Amino acid sequence: MQHPDSILTLLKKSEEFLKKKEIPSARLDAEILLADLLNLQRVKLYVNFERLLNETEKNAYRERILERSKNKPTAYITSQKAFYNSIFFVNENVLIPRPETEELVEKVLSDFKGNIGEQNVLDLCTGSGCIGISLKLARKDWNITLSDISKEALEVATKNAIQILGEEKHIQFLESDLFLSIPKESKFNLIVTNPPYIPISDKAEMMKDVIDYEPHLALFLENPKDFLSTLIAQAYERLVEGGKLYMEILPSLSETIISDSIAKGWENGKIEKDLSGKERFVILTR
């Protein structure tokens, strides 16, 4: 019989509790929260499953499980999220990085293989900085600018740049509503963005952990099509000839965005599907 304070027993009890609260992936969340608390890899929980937690550890774990039972995302409880081979600090001022955005980073790096030299790159609506910082890690010779309308989001991005890249000076940070505060003389070879694109009318269909905790400024729009059209038009003016815009978008808007953009002077455009088969990405060339 397992001791009531052992790792294995506490995991089982936590899983049962979270399931009763209708939390998806209850077991996984229970493991992540405990492994992070004990500073262990998840697999090490089972190597040490007979280990007993002390009173302080038990209380801290109980508090974490209670937070998760109220739909608080695991990433906000642990203050971190893995993204493209790095661990990013996150809080409720930034969107939690998604696997689809990792795919966006991968597409950029795949398209820009080889020694193409120095590139000026803008990560627009940067949030945690996960896109721009991941690109900088892979391509040291790229000049990266991170911009966001939210001062609090830029503070998170700055913290991540320091922790992951070693020195803040590797990247430029700009607080800006789209391109409004970005110097007009600044021209970019590449703009990458995961902007807000979910219609506010779809809000009720979202999971409670998203609605209750993630920043609505980074998610929802009254009119995504108009917002994205404005973004695309402004991006055109800031790209060099032959420059590219990579966007994560609402799949239902992909065809419209491509046709409208070509009609307004973009050289070409293409749609890329994510791993689930949705038309998630638009790539435009000036």
Curated annotation (Swiss-Prot):
Domain of life: Bacteria
Coiled-coil region list: none
InterPro entries reported for this sequence: DNA_methylase_N6_adenine_CS (IPR002052), HemK-like (IPR004556), N5-glutamine_MTase (IPR050320), PrmC_N (IPR040758), RF_methyltr_PrmC (IPR019874), SAM-dependent_MTases_sf (IPR029063), Small_mtfrase_dom (IPR007848)
Binding site for S-adenosyl-L-methionine: D148, N194
Keyword tags: Methyltransferase, S-adenosyl-L-methionine, Transferase
Binding site for substrate: N194, P195, P196, Y197
Record field: catalytic activity: L-glutaminyl-[peptide chain release factor] + S-adenosyl-L-methionine = N(5)-methyl-L-glutaminyl-[peptide chain release factor] + S-adenosyl-L-homocysteine + H(+)
Biological process according to GO: methylation; translational termination
Family named by the database record: Belongs to the protein N5-glutamine methyltransferase family. PrmC subfamily.
Function in brief: Methylates the class 1 translation termination release factors RF1/PrfA and RF2/PrfB on the glutamine residue of the universally conserved GGQ motif.
Protein name: Release factor glutamine methyltransferase
Organism this protein belongs to: Leptospira interrogans serogroup Icterohaemorrhagiae serovar Lai (strain 56601)
Name of the encoding gene: prmC
